[in-house]
């Protein structure tokens, strides 16, 4: 009975330490009960993102800009008792849990378990969304949803570059990322912003980022409804299709040029036709970017 009582008491004490201050400390990036000492500049910050916003922004002189090396963090400060100590999940002084999720490899703390954090050894960092829902693509060198397994277009180091819209580095971004049909990646929010501005092609390779068949049908109707003047009706131009990569020779039209191979209007003119009267004959045209 006594042993059971003491065991229950210990369990209750552990539960209390897990909850004391939970959700009340941290920053705009993470809820956590500790701060970190940056190994690069020896200053104290709530998290690595807070450090990078302060030390790697445009208002800092370029030769002073730097990012925090997350794996080199060795000291943390408990937010409740302010004790500085080696990296560990529970405070060495007051015993409070400094993060319900703790990764000793990334020196990472987070009290919000709803993110379903997990550490990927192949990525070398912690990710969110639940390990059971993701797989690591060795060629793309990042974690993707299992829905995409054996279904995505591989691109070497797909997320090891900046977003082509906002230029934030994608690999360790905390914002949602989408994989386009061509295999290139960008922030989901940036993709939606492109849609608001009627931009439906990949900023990297110019391929269509969604099913454009309905728009192509409308363009078929538009082209049929507006025949070219007699001086242009026999004019032929060479076009390159951004979607399938084919070079085809098609009839010139002011509205759009349709790929003879795949039927896409996401094309651009690559060579002057036989008739030089048109001022637009040498201009590139990407109809897929209009909506």
Curated annotation (Swiss-Prot):
<dbReference type="Pfam" id="PF05495">
    <property type="entry name" value="zf-CHY"/>
</dbReference>
<dbReference type="GO" id="GO:0005783">
    <property type="term" value="C:endoplasmic reticulum"/>
</dbReference>
<feature type="binding site">
    <location>
        <position position="78"/>
    </location>
    <ligand>
        <name>Zn(2+) 3</name>
    </ligand>
</feature>
<feature type="binding site">
    <location>
        <position position="136"/>
    </location>
    <ligand>
        <name>Zn(2+) 5</name>
    </ligand>
</feature>
<dbReference type="InterPro" id="IPR013083">
    <property type="entry name" value="Znf_RING/FYVE/PHD"/>
</dbReference>
<feature type="binding site">
    <location>
        <position position="119"/>
    </location>
    <ligand>
        <name>Zn(2+) 4</name>
    </ligand>
</feature>
<feature type="zinc finger region" description="CHY-type">
    <location>
        <begin position="20"/>
        <end position="96"/>
    </location>
</feature>
<feature type="modified residue" description="Phosphothreonine">
    <location>
        <position position="178"/>
    </location>
</feature>
<comment type="subunit">
    <text>Interacts with SRK2D/2SNRK2.2, SRK2I/SNRK2.3 and SRK2E/SNRK2.6.</text>
</comment>
<feature type="binding site">
    <location>
        <position position="41"/>
    </location>
    <ligand>
        <name>Zn(2+) 2</name>
    </ligand>
</feature>
<dbReference type="InterPro" id="IPR001841">
    <property type="entry name" value="Znf_RING"/>
</dbReference>
<feature type="binding site">
    <location>
        <position position="103"/>
    </location>
    <ligand>
        <name>Zn(2+) 4</name>
    </ligand>
</feature>
<keyword id="KW-0256">Endoplasmic reticulum</keyword>
<comment type="function">
    <text>Possesses E3 ubiquitin-protein ligase activity in vitro. Mediates mainly 'Lys-48'-linked polyubiquitination. Promotes abscisic acid (ABA)-induced stomatal closure, reactive oxygen species (ROS) production and drought tolerance. Involved in the regulation of stomatal aperture.</text>
</comment>
<keyword id="KW-0963">Cytoplasm</keyword>
<protein>
    <recommendedName>
        <fullName>E3 ubiquitin-protein ligase RZFP34</fullName>
        <ecNumber>2.3.2.27</ecNumber>
    </recommendedName>
</protein>
<keyword id="KW-0808">Transferase</keyword>
<feature type="binding site">
    <location>
        <position position="137"/>
    </location>
    <ligand>
        <name>Zn(2+) 6</name>
    </ligand>
</feature>
<dbReference type="GO" id="GO:0016740">
    <property type="term" value="F:transferase activity"/>
</dbReference>
<dbReference type="InterPro" id="IPR017921">
    <property type="entry name" value="Znf_CTCHY"/>
</dbReference>
<dbReference type="InterPro" id="IPR039512">
    <property type="entry name" value="RCHY1_zinc-ribbon"/>
</dbReference>
<feature type="zinc finger region" description="RING-type; atypical">
    <location>
        <begin position="163"/>
        <end position="206"/>
    </location>
</feature>
<keyword id="KW-0862">Zinc</keyword>
<feature type="binding site">
    <location>
        <position position="51"/>
    </location>
    <ligand>
        <name>Zn(2+) 2</name>
    </ligand>
</feature>
<feature type="binding site">
    <location>
        <position position="152"/>
    </location>
    <ligand>
        <name>Zn(2+) 6</name>
    </ligand>
</feature>
<keyword id="KW-0346">Stress response</keyword>
<comment type="pathway">
    <text>Protein modification; protein ubiquitination.</text>
</comment>
<keyword id="KW-0479">Metal-binding</keyword>
<feature type="binding site">
    <location>
        <position position="120"/>
    </location>
    <ligand>
        <name>Zn(2+) 5</name>
    </ligand>
</feature>
<feature type="binding site">
    <location>
        <position position="143"/>
    </location>
    <ligand>
        <name>Zn(2+) 5</name>
    </ligand>
</feature>
<feature type="binding site">
    <location>
        <position position="126"/>
    </location>
    <ligand>
        <name>Zn(2+) 4</name>
    </ligand>
</feature>
<feature type="binding site">
    <location>
        <position position="47"/>
    </location>
    <ligand>
        <name>Zn(2+) 1</name>
    </ligand>
</feature>
<dbReference type="GO" id="GO:0005634">
    <property type="term" value="C:nucleus"/>
</dbReference>
<feature type="binding site">
    <location>
        <position position="140"/>
    </location>
    <ligand>
        <name>Zn(2+) 6</name>
    </ligand>
</feature>
<feature type="binding site">
    <location>
        <position position="50"/>
    </location>
    <ligand>
        <name>Zn(2+) 1</name>
    </ligand>
</feature>
<feature type="binding site">
    <location>
        <position position="40"/>
    </location>
    <ligand>
        <name>Zn(2+) 2</name>
    </ligand>
</feature>
<feature type="binding site">
    <location>
        <position position="91"/>
    </location>
    <ligand>
        <name>Zn(2+) 3</name>
    </ligand>
</feature>
<dbReference type="InterPro" id="IPR037275">
    <property type="entry name" value="Znf_CTCHY_sf"/>
</dbReference>
<keyword id="KW-0539">Nucleus</keyword>
<dbReference type="GO" id="GO:0008270">
    <property type="term" value="F:zinc ion binding"/>
</dbReference>
<dbReference type="GO" id="GO:1902456">
    <property type="term" value="P:regulation of stomatal opening"/>
</dbReference>
<keyword id="KW-0863">Zinc-finger</keyword>
